[in-house]
């Protein structure tokens, strides 16, 4: 059976990873005395996010936050060939350069009610199904923000985290970090990569 898809015809699909067993301050909760944060999360193929164009990335707030401004804020994506994270942070780049999918100086975060909040990815990020490194990095805030849900992953080394808390360096910010097994509750919106329109005559010629 030969299926011919029109470009742009496929619908977007959402994929959820992680869980809601833990209320976690990282990485958007300046109210806890956090002055700077660097945070990495690894999403592996078995988490089930399909290949395609990533168009939106979201977190699930536990509610009860306050509006916050985050300085020198950026979110980065990078596909890598690993099943767990190592130290220091930059070793997880595998000699590649991550793609900035969101940034702001400041980035203004409203106080979301319990539920999803996040970022549209423009242009979209082409995801080919390998492990996806997600990184959040900011330095300076207005003591606002929100807590988010996560769970402890069955596989270790899924998260690397460092911060400055109440002027004290924790876990060797910004370069070293400490490994955790947190897997944050996140949602990815994926649009399958469109197939270019092909004339029926061209298809017949290819299959003679």
Segments from the language model and where they lie:
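Bacterial N-terminal signal peptides
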Residues: 1-6
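Boundary/junction segments of secreted and surface-exposed precursor proteins
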Residues: 8-37, 92, 179-208
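A short beta-strand-loop element at or near the start of a globular domain
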Residues: 19-64
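A short, local hydrophobic-aromatic micro-motif
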Residues: 55-56, 71, 201
């Amino acid at each position: 059976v030969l299926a011919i898809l029109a470009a742009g015809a496929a619908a977007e699909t959402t994929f959820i990873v992680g869980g809601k067993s833990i209320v976690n301050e990282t990485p958007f909760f300046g109210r806890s005395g956090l002055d700077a944060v660097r945070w990495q999360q690894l999403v592996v193929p078995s988490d089930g996010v399909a290949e395609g164009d990533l168009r939106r990335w979201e977190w699930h707030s536990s509610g009860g936050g306050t509006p916050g401004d985050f300085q020198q804020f950026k979110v980065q994506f990078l596909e890598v060939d690993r099943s767990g994270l190592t130290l220091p942070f930059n070793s997880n780049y595998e000699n590649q350069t991550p793609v900035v999918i969101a940034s702001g100086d400041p980035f203004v975060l409203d106080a979301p009610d319990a539920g999803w909040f996040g970022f549209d990815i423009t242009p979209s990020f082409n995801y080919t199904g390998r492990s996806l490194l997600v990184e959040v990095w900011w330095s300076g805030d207005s003591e606002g923000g929100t807590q988010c849900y996560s769970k402890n992953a069955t596989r270790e080394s899924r998260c690397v985290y460092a911060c400055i808390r109440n002027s004290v360096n924790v876990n060797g910010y910004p370069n070293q970090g400490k490994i955790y097994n947190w897997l944050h509750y996140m949602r990815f919106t994926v649009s399958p990569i469109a197939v270019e329109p092909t004339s029926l005559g061209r298809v017949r010629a290819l299959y003679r």
